[in-house]
UniProtKB/Swiss-Prot annotation:
It is a multi-pass membrane protein. This is Photosystem I assembly protein Ycf4. It is found in: Plastid, Chloroplast thylakoid membrane. Seems to be required for the assembly of the photosystem I complex. Keywords: Chloroplast, Membrane, Photosynthesis, Plastid, Thylakoid, Transmembrane, Transmembrane helix. Its main location: plastid.
Length: 185
């Protein structure tokens, strides 16, 4: 969701609460439970899963490996669920022409620096940059170059769903709003 007026442009960012992250966290969790159940049933010698008789899988080495994969998958799945719960990467970009201030806010991982808040003046913005990489894994990222601070990404680096036209239009609108040039690299 975005909000725009004559002097203020606010762009809300979704973060890690995306449908794809929910899907992969569920798949990984269920698959890990399956691996762990197969490993446990081979250790106990009891048939915990009706599809696969436990007599066919020996505990050493197959059951140990299945248990290891199950535990590793549960750790990775818990990491995904934590990033979804904490909504890592969400936040907003606020461009205020009237006050001459740009604010960038993102939620990070819990800790001392959970809230990432950057604030600088509009006059310190040198340009809006577009990075385009075509090929098997195309990437189109929008950056803001700030005097003395380098470049700051405005779009997520994993968002490859922007068409060239969409990223150019977004860059042109933002550059016009802020009164800065566009660079492509």
């Amino acid at each position: 969701m975005n909000w725009r007026s004559e002097h203020i442009w606010i762009e809300l960012l979704k973060g890690s609460r995306k449908r794809g992250n929910f899907f992969w966290a569920c798949i990984l969790f269920l698959g890990s439970l399956g691996f762990l159940a197969v490993g446990a049933s081979s250790y106990l010698g009891k048939n915990m899963i009706s599809l696969l008789p436990s007599q066919q899988i020996l505990f050493f080495p197959q059951g140990v490996v299945m248990s290891f994969y199950g535990i590793a998958g549960l750790f990775i799945s818990s990491y995904l669920w934590c990033t979804i719960l904490w909504n890592v990467g969400s936040g907003y970009d606020r461009f205020d022409r009237k006050e001459g201030i740009v604010c960038i806010f993102r939620w990070g991982f819990p800790g001392i620096k959970r809230r990432i808040f950057l604030q600088f003046l509009v006059r310190d913005i040198q340009s809006i940059r577009i990075q385009v990489k075509e090929g098997l894994y195309p990437r189109r990222i929008l950056y803001m170059e700030i005097r003395g601070q380098g470049v700051i990404p405005l779009t997520r680096t994993d968002e490859k769903f922007f068409t060239p036209r969409e990223i150019e239009q977004k860059a042109a609108e933002l550059a016009y709003f802020l009164g800065v040039p566009i660079e492509v690299f």
